[in-house]
């Protein structure tokens, strides 16, 4: 188990706040599981503009992207979105 702190970018927080409480609870549990064992949850990866490895997974109806900041011991959640690509305002 990693001892990462969990950080969410503003856009991820805004997405979470627009969800039902049940969806927020589901995502909170998934984010904590990812924080504890990030590599167990990585289903794909891509490189960002500076070459950093961004990993992602699908959790139910949500897509989550994150990266491990090993220098700061943070797991940074950079994106939470609908897995089917729909608009953030629709449920």
Report residues per predicted region.
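Short, mixed-charge, low-aromatic patches
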Residues: 22-23, 45
